[in-house]
Amino acid sequence: MDTRPIGFLDSGVGGLTVVCELIRQLPHEKIVYIGDSARAPYGPRPKKQIKEYTWELVNFLLTQNVKMIVFACNTATAVAWEEVKAALDIPVLGVVLPGASAAIKSTTKGQVGVIGTPMTVASDIYRKKIQLLAPSVQVRSLACPKFVPIVESNEMCSSIAKKIVYDSLAPLVGKIDTLVLGCTHYPLLRPIIQNVMGPSVKLIDSGAECVRDISVLLNYFDINGNYHQKAVKHRFFTTANPEIFQEIASIWLKQKINVEHVTL
């Protein structure tokens, strides 16, 4: 038994979609979450800067005595995950491979779409992972740089959000049967995305898929938390306005949480 927390990092609030699924599947595990909303989005930034920011988040989580780090951010996974994984002596998990594997299982026509930040799409990481496992699958990737700002400003239900999603996804409509939400912010726009793509297109939440791998690693390294612990205290940190973060988090997690401000 290992009662240390699992650390989650993201460029902002998007990683809460992963946390929500973890709380549902593994309610006995403690969580420490750091969202770098003050510098979001990461997607348009240079690789060197993304690596620098990611390491700052990692080092912060290490001060919290975490037993595992989850990159709840596709951009950080694409740019820095392998480097961080090689450098640390605790498990480090990204969201890309679980999402890619789920897309392969889902597609019936071999036509998969991937949407993400400009950096995630430019890295081509999803296509590489998907075609490494299933070479015959065709992958269409599309950058959606306007999605993260919508979520970070808590405007997911606005009319402008609907128009932006509709216009952004137009190149993929009617051309795929599976769509990977290659940014953990995007599930917060899921109802609009599903409406635009149509009911026949299966949406893959890379973050939710990641939780299954977290469970496997906890078992493999024998670092599961206390199954009998009912009242688990989580900690949430943001580099931006705690009130905005708390508002979004409370809606998504369906519970009121305390959010602490941190300067990196």
Curated annotation (Swiss-Prot):
InterPro entries found in the cross-reference section: Asp/Glu/hydantoin_racemase (IPR015942), Asp/Glu_race (IPR001920), Asp/Glu_racemase_AS_2 (IPR033134), Glu_race (IPR004391)
Chemical reaction(s) catalysed: L-glutamate = D-glutamate
PROSITE patterns xref list: ASP_GLU_RACEMASE_2 (PS00924)
Enzyme class: isomerase
Record bears the keyword Cell wall biogenesis/degradation: yes
Superkingdom of source: Bacteria
Keywords of the record: Cell shape, Cell wall biogenesis/degradation, Isomerase, Peptidoglycan synthesis
Protein name, entry field: Glutamate racemase
Organism: Streptococcus pyogenes serotype M3 (strain ATCC BAA-595 / MGAS315)
Gene: murI
